[in-house]
Amino acid sequence: MSLFGSSPPNDGSAALNPAKTANSSRSTLFDNEAPTTRSGSALFADDDHDSPWDMPTPRKQRSRADLIRNLLPSGDVPESYIETFDAVVRTENRSTNGRITAGGVARTLAAAKLGADDQARIMGIIAPASASATGAGGGGDGAHGGEANSSAAAAAAAVGLGDLGRNEFNVLLALIGLVQEGEVASLDGVDERRRNLPQPKLQGLVNENVQPMLPNLSELGAKPPQRPVTPPKAPTPSPPKQQQQQQHQPPTLRKVSMEYPEDPWNAPDLHKGHNHGPLEHSTGHNGAADVPRSVANDLNGNDAVSYSTSPEVTTTSSALPGRTTSTFTTSQPPSGPSSIHNVAESIQESNGAWNYFPGSSSGGGFGEPADNAITGPFGDSGGPGQSVSGSVGGSNPNRSIGHVRSGSNVEENILVTLMPEKEGVFMFQHHNYEVSSIRRGSKVVRRYSDFVWLLDCLHKRYPFRVLPLLPPKRVAFNGNHLSNDGAFIEKRRRGLARFLNALVRHPVLGQEQLVIMFLTVPTELSVWRKQATISVQDEFTGRTLPPGLEDSLPPTLEELFARTRVGVRRSAELYISTCTIMDRLIKRSEGVAADHARMAVSLISLTETSADTYATDHNDVPLLNDGLQAMGRHLRTAQTLMEDEAKAWEEGVLEDLKRQRDALVSLRDMFDRRDRLDKDNIPFLQRRIETNEAKLQALNAKPEGMVKPGEKERVVEAIIKDKESIVTQHNRSVFVKECIRDELRFFQNTQYNVSRLTQDWAQERVKYSEMLADNWRRLLDDLEGMPLGD
């Protein structure tokens, strides 16, 4: 007898199955037990039966996919999660667009070395459909199966799984970490550990692909400022809560992949033969909110090592021959702190959770380190014989033909997409471009004039650096502007992408505040420019000359500049011609493919007339038509292969050639700007100083009453101002030489881009040649049945 006068309709079934009753009465938020007994409409095992305590209008429930997508955003996970995602993405095909396929998930599960049951449970949470498909065969291996069984189970568990984005992959890594720590894999457990996520151990997955960001930087940077040796600072005590978190936090993947975190810019081979071992440093989460700045530096390994910048430590400056300088240039006038250092500090604080990719430094330039920070990106660290992994220009880092290069580092890739609709009134319409960065998690809309403004600001602030090129606004022929057709707009879009990628991969320009704001400010740039205070001062303004910097520059530097300029000018012309020839080759390949299609149509049409043509004897006509149809089919296949190859050339080797061409032309333009801007009037000032000194001696020789009041002071003040101007101009010329030298060292790595593009193109030629040869071999087999009349 019920309280309301009647019994529930399923009372009998509940009495027969008390376990089912217990399960149905349970109502929790993250109930992941017995997923097969849940209703398909419930999100977290909510009761299917109505309750008198239900709200009149229940809120709209989200699907499991939406929950997993929003459970662990990129800003809330450790940096090891981000590195693992990037490592798996590098092994994927280029067509994944930053997502991980089922094959990548299978490799991740295999690297975790979990049992088949644990893998099936994790896949049941990430993708219930795949778990049900593999649950029957995955339970018999046990948790202690061998590596082969683990790989097979991982591959089986990933069957039927769709592509995973960064957020879904974060949940997968958290579930793997929970299982490895002995906890139950569930979304409930992931949500409870949101602030202290487990660190999964994926042996062989990250170490084989992740290399130091910028190996070998001692040869590539200016020497740091020479200062007296100061005793190392005592480490800042961490708060008790932070210390406890560091004690219980498992080691991150960065510690595994970087053997020497105190020297992150150098390869491990540099430290072979040294009598020191790797220091222990703890790393924190990428997006920790309550960690003080000093503690964050300790977590990143930046404050653990004290770098001495004394003259004794600078080994190269003492070995170089001395340089005679004027007495005016040996003394330094008092000046305030370096404005470049202040700008870099503001950039460092505004980088957000990512802390700038591929590396952030609070130094002002290539060789200006900050206090207790790793010199970078061109500082005095590294060893000979190594190269910087950064590059000039931009291309898709995931593009790989044949195999994945394990030695290439992950580069930030800026995507530029043409918006479908134009903006503006008639006759004044313009295209908009969506600029997105997966690494920064930003997506903004910019127009072509915004790119022009950014480049103008960079020309004023960094006139002696390699500034990338912008594509033209319109194409002109004999002074007449041609129409902006779709092909030109597409070429301009690719040129804008190369421009931005060259900026963000430059060690100094990538940290410029204007560049960061250009990529991250979501509002219209013209509105932001009116509200923001923008400084476009020269980067050398207010910067003092460090002791020993001038002596560290070799005396043959000008000869090196002149020789490099001649080679760059000739190479730029040749690369411009090479890009034009490659463009013609692509057009011809497309034309040959179209001719194959026309020939296929003609052969198929011949089959319609064969019966009438050979009406005398119809016996061999069917075999003849079969051969013609097979010929047409394989010609169509050849057409498709040729079109695909032409498209691959256009998106691959042609873009790589243009990237190299832009780097050479940018360097050529930098030398031209130096001829215009690196000028001084030091000889004139020296002659005026000599004149004023002679005048001052004459005034001193006169009696007191014969000298006008204040005349001596005016002459002395003029001499002091001229000497200070000489010192400033001389220091600027030294900074310019140092800057150009560092730019040449950074540009030196473009030779490796040439090696990669030629190897990739050769692999593409081999791949498509083999596919075409296989197509013709199959055609030959199909033509064996044609009548020969023998």
Swiss-Prot record:
<dbReference type="GO" id="GO:0005829">
    <property type="term" value="C:cytosol"/>
</dbReference>
<keyword id="KW-0653">Protein transport</keyword>
<keyword id="KW-0813">Transport</keyword>
<dbReference type="GO" id="GO:0006623">
    <property type="term" value="P:protein targeting to vacuole"/>
</dbReference>
<feature type="binding site">
    <location>
        <position position="449"/>
    </location>
    <ligand>
        <name>a 1,2-diacyl-sn-glycero-3-phospho-(1D-myo-inositol-3-phosphate)</name>
    </ligand>
</feature>
<dbReference type="GO" id="GO:0005768">
    <property type="term" value="C:endosome"/>
</dbReference>
<dbReference type="InterPro" id="IPR028662">
    <property type="entry name" value="SNX8/Mvp1"/>
</dbReference>
<comment type="similarity">
    <text>Belongs to the sorting nexin family.</text>
</comment>
<feature type="region of interest" description="Disordered">
    <location>
        <begin position="215"/>
        <end position="342"/>
    </location>
</feature>
<feature type="compositionally biased region" description="Low complexity">
    <location>
        <begin position="386"/>
        <end position="400"/>
    </location>
</feature>
<dbReference type="GO" id="GO:0016020">
    <property type="term" value="C:membrane"/>
</dbReference>
<feature type="region of interest" description="Disordered">
    <location>
        <begin position="373"/>
        <end position="406"/>
    </location>
</feature>
<dbReference type="InterPro" id="IPR001683">
    <property type="entry name" value="PX_dom"/>
</dbReference>
<keyword id="KW-0963">Cytoplasm</keyword>
<dbReference type="InterPro" id="IPR036871">
    <property type="entry name" value="PX_dom_sf"/>
</dbReference>
<feature type="binding site">
    <location>
        <position position="473"/>
    </location>
    <ligand>
        <name>a 1,2-diacyl-sn-glycero-3-phospho-(1D-myo-inositol-3-phosphate)</name>
    </ligand>
</feature>
<feature type="binding site">
    <location>
        <position position="492"/>
    </location>
    <ligand>
        <name>a 1,2-diacyl-sn-glycero-3-phospho-(1D-myo-inositol-3-phosphate)</name>
    </ligand>
</feature>
<feature type="compositionally biased region" description="Basic and acidic residues">
    <location>
        <begin position="269"/>
        <end position="283"/>
    </location>
</feature>
<feature type="compositionally biased region" description="Pro residues">
    <location>
        <begin position="225"/>
        <end position="240"/>
    </location>
</feature>
<keyword id="KW-0472">Membrane</keyword>
<feature type="domain" description="PX">
    <location>
        <begin position="411"/>
        <end position="525"/>
    </location>
</feature>
<comment type="function">
    <text>Required for vacuolar protein sorting.</text>
</comment>
<dbReference type="GO" id="GO:0032266">
    <property type="term" value="F:phosphatidylinositol-3-phosphate binding"/>
</dbReference>
<dbReference type="InterPro" id="IPR045734">
    <property type="entry name" value="Snx8_BAR_dom"/>
</dbReference>
<protein>
    <recommendedName>
        <fullName>Sorting nexin mvp1</fullName>
    </recommendedName>
</protein>
<feature type="compositionally biased region" description="Polar residues">
    <location>
        <begin position="20"/>
        <end position="40"/>
    </location>
</feature>
<dbReference type="InterPro" id="IPR035704">
    <property type="entry name" value="SNX8/Mvp1_PX"/>
</dbReference>
<feature type="compositionally biased region" description="Low complexity">
    <location>
        <begin position="324"/>
        <end position="339"/>
    </location>
</feature>
<dbReference type="Pfam" id="PF00787">
    <property type="entry name" value="PX"/>
</dbReference>
<feature type="compositionally biased region" description="Polar residues">
    <location>
        <begin position="297"/>
        <end position="319"/>
    </location>
</feature>
<feature type="compositionally biased region" description="Low complexity">
    <location>
        <begin position="241"/>
        <end position="252"/>
    </location>
</feature>
<feature type="binding site">
    <location>
        <position position="447"/>
    </location>
    <ligand>
        <name>a 1,2-diacyl-sn-glycero-3-phospho-(1D-myo-inositol-3-phosphate)</name>
    </ligand>
</feature>
<dbReference type="InterPro" id="IPR027267">
    <property type="entry name" value="AH/BAR_dom_sf"/>
</dbReference>
<feature type="compositionally biased region" description="Polar residues">
    <location>
        <begin position="1"/>
        <end position="10"/>
    </location>
</feature>
<dbReference type="GO" id="GO:0042147">
    <property type="term" value="P:retrograde transport, endosome to Golgi"/>
</dbReference>
<dbReference type="Pfam" id="PF19566">
    <property type="entry name" value="Snx8_BAR_dom"/>
</dbReference>
<feature type="region of interest" description="Disordered">
    <location>
        <begin position="1"/>
        <end position="62"/>
    </location>
</feature>
